[in-house]
Each structure stands twice: as C-alpha cells, then as structure tokens.
From Swiss-Prot:
GO molecular function (one): protein serine/threonine kinase activity
Tissue expression notes: Strongly expressed in the eye, gill, kidney, spleen, muscle, ovary and testis and weakly in the heart, liver, and gut. Expressed in the brain and lateral mesoderm at 12 hours post-fertilization (hpf).
Residues covered by region (Disordered): 423-518
Protein name: Maternal embryonic leucine zipper kinase
Encoding gene, per UniProt annotation: melk
Listed Basic and acidic residues bias regions: 423-443
Phosphoserine modified-residue sites: S173
Top-level class of the enzyme under EC nomenclature: transferase
Phosphothreonine sites (modified residues): T169
Residues forming the catalytic site: D134 (proton acceptor)
Amino acid sequence: MPVDSTSELLKHYEVYETIGSGGFAKVKLGRHKLTGEKVAIKIMEKKDLGDDLPRVKIEIEAMKNLSHQHVCRLYHVIETTSKIYMVLEYCPGGELFDYIIAKDRLSEEETRVFFRQIISALAYVHSQGYAHRDLKPENLLIDEDHNLKLIDFGLCAKPKGGLGFELLTCCGSPAYAAPELIQGKAYIGSEADVWSMGVLLYALLCGFLPFDDDNCMVLYRKITRGKYSNPHWLSPSSILLLNQMMQVDPKRRLTVKHLLDHPWVMRGYSTPVEWHSKYPLGHIDEDCITEMAVTFKQSKQRTIQLVSEWKYDQITATYLLLLAKKRQGRPVRLRAECPVIDIVCSPLQDMQLKKSLRFTEDDDGVHPVVLGSMVFPPDCYDDENPWTPLTPKNTHTTNTPRMKLYPETTEKWNEMAYSPVIEHSRPCRQKPERRERTKENKENLAVPGTDGDVFALPAPRTPTSSRKVKSNRTVMTTPNHNNNKSSEVNKGAGSATKEGSRRREVEQQQNGQQGELNILAFSPERRSRSLDLAGCQVDSGQKRKGGKVFGSLERGLDKVITMLTPSKKRGPRDGPRKIKAQYNVTLTNQTNADQVLNQILSILPEKNVDFVQKGYTLKCHTQSDFGKVTMQFELEVCLLQKPEVVGIRRQRLKGDAWVYKHLVEDILSSSSQWSA
C-alpha cells in the first residue's frame, strides 16, 4: 500500500550524496539507521517511468526471488503515491568496467577469477527461471571483498513456459547482443546470455570489444557474421573458449552447464564452479532474531514470524543487514532506535514538503571526508564509534561530489546547465511507436495484473506556476560555439547545418539498402536501463520532463535531510579532495593540482568537449552535429593520500561505455604529464 510521504524513507535511512543517475532514477548513498550499514537507495519517479513502470515490478520481483553471493541484494522497497524507493546492497569497488580501464586489460589468471564468479551468478539466475539479457561490465559491481555482484534486472525475463520458452523482445546493449536477437528472430534467453558472456570475457582479456563500430548497421553486420580478431596475447585455450561461446548458431554454443567445468575455467582449480547459493532464501539466523527481538521488544517467536513474511520492509531490511554484518565477522548489534522526527506537522507543512521534494543537485559547499572509495560527512560513525542521536536544530545539509554507482548508457543526465534532449551514440537508432513497445513486452506474462496496475499510479498533478532558479555556475564551451549562454548550454535540432542534412540523407539511403540483412534496430526504450542501477534510458518527449521533476525533488529531499543528517560546518572549497587510490583514478607524476587542472582545461576545447567547472570537478559533455548531447562524464582533479601525487578521477555519466573509454584515454594521453 503506498504511503503518502517520503518520511517513511527518512525514518529508517540517512541519505547522502547522489552516486548514480539516469533518466528514470537517481541512486543515492545511504546508511541504515538501526544497523549502521551503507546502502544504495534507488529513487524512481512514477510519472517519469511511464510505460516502464511494469519493468520496475519485474526487477523488484526478480530481486526478491534471488539470493546469491554474486547477485546484488535487495533489502527494502518503499512505495509512495509518486515514487518508488529500492534499497540495495552497496558495492564500494564500483563497476567492473572501470576496473578494466584501470588495468587496460586483465591477465588470464585474474580474468578466470572474475569469470568463474560471473558463471556462478548466471547459472544460479538461470536455475531460478530468469534470463538476464543485459550482461556487460557496467552491470557487474565490485564489493569490498573484491567479489563481483550482478545488478540491473530491469530487462530480465522469466518466461511463463520456463527458460526454454522462446522470447521475442529485442533488448539489451547492441555490442553484447546475440546475432539471433538483433535479427529479430525468436531466441532462448539463456543462449543469448552465453553469447553476452563471451563478449564480456573477450573484453576482460583484451580491453576492447570483439564487435564494435560507430555505425550500428555495420556493428550488426559484424555480429551476424561472428567474425572478430584474436590479439596475439590470447592463449590457444582462451581463443577456443571464446569461439565456443560466440557461435552464430545458438545451438552450437556452449551452455552454462558446460562452462561450470570447462578446461579453461578449471585451470588452477580443483573443483567446478560452485553456483548454488550460499545464502538460500528463507534462512533464519538465531543471533539476528535474538538481537531484533530485544531491540523491538518482541518475543523471538513473533520476530521469526515477522521476518518470515519477507515483505521487504523495515523488518526485512534490518534482518538482512544484520545478517550481512554477521557474515563479515562483525558484532550482531542494533542501535537503540532514536526518536523519529515528525516531519509533517501540519497540512501546510505537508503541502510544502510534497511541493519541494524533487531531485536536483546543489553546489557542494563542504569539504567531505573520504572513507575508502566513498565520500561521507566527517562525523559519520563506524561500528566501533558510539551512535549519537540526531537533533534537528544543529544539523546542516551535506552535499558532496557524486560518484556513479549504477551508470546508464543512454539515459538523461538531469543537470540544470545542460539540454535535456538526448541523442544516442549510434546514428541509426529509430524512435519506435509507444504502442509497438507495449506489444513486444510479452516475456514476463507471469506477473499478475495488468501493466497499469503494477503499482498505484500517481495522482494527477494540479497545474502550478513555478519559477526557475538560474544557476550561477560558469559554463565553459569550446571555441566553435557562440558566446551566448543560452546557445552554449541548450542547442536544439534547429542548429543543424546543410552538411548535417546531407548526412541524414546518406544514412537513410544506407538504412534502406540493409533490408536483405533482416536486422532489427535497437530502440532507445528497449536498450539497457542499468541503474544501474545504472543505469541505467530515454528519448521521448514525455520523459524529457523528468529533468524538471527530478530537479526540484532532490533539492527538496536535501532540505529534509538537513534535519536528519550529522552536522557539518559549511565552508568554501579552496583545494582538491584528498582520496585513496581507486580503480577510476588515473595517477599523474605531478604534485600541483592547479597545474594539472589547467592542463586539462586547455586540452578539452581541442577535443571538442564542453564542460561546466565546479571547483576541481569538470562536468563534461560532447554533442552531435545536431547539438544533442551524446556523452557526459566527470573529471575531477584530486590529491591521493598514497602516493602523494595528483590524480584524475573519471566517471562516466551517460553514453556508450567504450566510446567514453577511448575519449578519456585520448584526453589524458594528450598531455605528457600523466605517469605510466
């Protein structure tokens, strides 16, 4: 049953900075109050989800039914009249994709460690009747123990007739999609997943994709032919395994069952891959039950009864997070429940709260303290430190630089300085009709009810006037743009040149000549939504409104968090952040952060990259010939603790992951100051 207020979330969680963003959702770093455990909070606006609301239901139902050591855990689901919150396991190591970039490519031995975990996760997911359909490095996160966790089940399918039932929907990420899928043929989900695993294995071993091209029709042709190069460093056994997994004929491909004890997978190991869950659903731990019973002042029998309902509410979240603490060898202890601040004290305040709860990003005015690979306020607690009850009178909002946890390849970036109009990096994608999309989503027929009744629909919005707050950020653009600020930050399709028109005509002619290949182009709505997380993706007029909706809601949420987060004195940021070395940080041989920043500022215009500067952070984006944003990413100059040198933190926000990789490498290699 939906609740009316966001206070249900803030009653149980402390909410910190945005760590992921997309067209449909924001992901914020949070901390569960009773256990002190860090979590990722995925926040979705129902009105922005539109026809994708049933997909959220599919993802939630899948994650409720999956409990595995290499699958991201769902803890809590909160639904309000306008929003859906998913509280998920937090993985501080970031994406496997960033790890590949940091290493350039992985050794066969390290690849084997990761790949065994991927096989384990997929074998389990398939055993539960699900096909993932969106396997890629961006959808695998690294936890604090350097183990992989599979995320983003928004495109998964659980056919009513079983996993052997043929699917029809063309979805996922084109570079990882199987030939039968992009040709529009009926396909078996598990067979398509094996192809994607082969592409993923190739990316781990080589540092680039086996099938890649700027033109998606050329890309599809390469995939349907199944021809790719084998770099000289690949061993014969690796080449053989890749060939067995990336067979154009799905019936000739290896199965996940064969991968469990494949000779390449077994090298250096005495046992096949263990795919069974170490954490079976329904397990009740006596120590966790005892601690909860004492804290909640309930009998153990009653506590077991409440936990066994698995409602994915506060009871479920508390139990699962306590269990996670125990598995990590930490004390099974809960904090004494602090008094809950009644945020909504009157109808007027209730109205003001609902009006103000929108998502946006305010300027950071504080110096964050870095713990590992995450940013926290200075007085955040650890398990060893005592807990201090929070009072509303001396707390301040803490806004810190965001790091992306669940990136999206084709989603909006809700930044005030940028145009909300997005163009995907592949030039030949076409915008499908909404009615066609509805017809094609038939894999998950087991979900009860109609699409429109999956969640309670939001109430119609009463038209109100609003004033736009002008940003005071400095917008830096490349020399080939006009000096007018409006043209710098919001270029529409009207700026297209004659050359662009000719290019469109050529592309249309090319597309018309590809009919004999019978290739089905990926629609933006059915591409990966990796929020996500990352994700993680929109290209419709309806969803362009999401920028404004998310914008003010997050700002309002920050205002509410002001009353509930630890206090922090505000002060101007007069220097770069000090952080520990991370996978997404490039080391330099410099000690002067300002010098490195100036070098980057001089390089970006040469690469036709526009940017907005906020202190030592550059929010960058590239545009197509028609003025639409195709890539968004962050570069932040920071100081490393060990070694004491300047580093550049890089983070993809939107756009094709491999295009981003090449662009950032080009930017950093353009200066002679980066260390090897």
